[in-house]
Amino acid sequence: METITIGSTGPLTGGAASYGISVKQGAEIAIEEINNAGGVKVGDKSYNLALQFEDDEADEEKARTAYSTLMDKKVDVIMGAVTSGSSLAITDLTKADNILQLTPSGSAAAITANDNVFRLCFTDPIQGKTIADYIIKQGYDSVAVLYNNSDEYSTGVYEAFKNELIETGNPELLVAEESFVSDDVDFTAQLTKIKATDAKIIFVPAYYEAAAYIAKQVKDLGLEVEIVGSDGWDGVLGQVTDTSVLDGVVFLTPFYPTDPSEKVQNFVKTYKAKYNNAIPDQFAADSYDSVYVLKAAFEKAGTKDTADLIKAMTEISVDGLTGQISFDVSGDPIKEAKFVVIENGAYQTKDID
């Protein structure tokens, strides 16, 4: 049987390695399942899937080099990059090479500007808007924001959040805007300023490494405040030794491993068995779903031609781990967001009244 090769680039080493490893492992499980079930039927031919994954260390220049390596190896589609900066770094390259690009986890709005690029995860604007609407709906009268102004993801979510407060006529809810930069671990100065405002809730659009430090320091400084996070908080439980510092934290996510659905629990069981009892995160789930989306696109197109694949991407609907997935004409996903709350060291569904 011939092979369709999925080319992927993401961090397997460096500070963001956990994201790339999750994406690689989620894809490997999906590919194994698909191949065991007979592969991908494209027209009247069946193909096995294979994954070629290159390490980009979440670095834009290294992402371009990794992409070049993938093209030299004659991959059929690109599933990447993992991070927003690296995804943006290769979009014009994939456009010039006329190859379909699907990022499982790059959330910056500009990534899907080219018609050959799609994304599986939520966009930054959707996250910011959804979390602002949550805060308004829950009746909080004051909110502080602590975001990473050196990171495109964090800044993008923050800006969309602020814009939604303005557009809904609630700008007065935002009583403090504090920032930090990547690799910061001491947030005392920012949190002390926030404490002085008596904000009832802090919104932290950030990845889980910084999020863990912030949550602990909120407790250490005695802030009596709720915390809400973006999807970058997924995995934060693995960053703390005392999970009680995270009790009550709410964050937006497309996936959580304690979801009781049969589909999710089967995936979690397989993932743990294959990867030394590791618990899958949303990056693994988005990647798993991305492989099934690509399978559906090839089968809908009936050909490996890029133009036909692009058309097929806007016509398919896939029942994934992260929900029912389809795509709009701009390449962004249409699927439902979920909120989870951390309680007693576990992720639980957050009911939104």
Predicted feature residues:
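An alpha-beta-alpha
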Residues: 117-178, 201, 294
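Periplasmic-binding protein-like
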Residues: 70-82, 102-104, 144-147, 198-208, ...
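Extracellular/periplasmic bilobed ligand-binding domains
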Residues: 157-252
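Segments of small-molecule ligand-sensing domains
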Residues: 273-284, 295-346
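Extracytoplasmic "Venus flytrap"
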Residues: 7-28, 54-60, 83-85, 146-155, ...
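Signal peptide-proximal N-terminal region
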Residues: 4, 25-51, 166-172
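Extracellular/periplasmic periplasmic-binding protein-like sensory domains
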Residues: 215-288, 341-353
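Beta-alpha junction/loop-to-helix N-cap segments that form part of ligand/metal-binding clefts
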Residues: 19-22, 40-111, 120, 180-184, ...
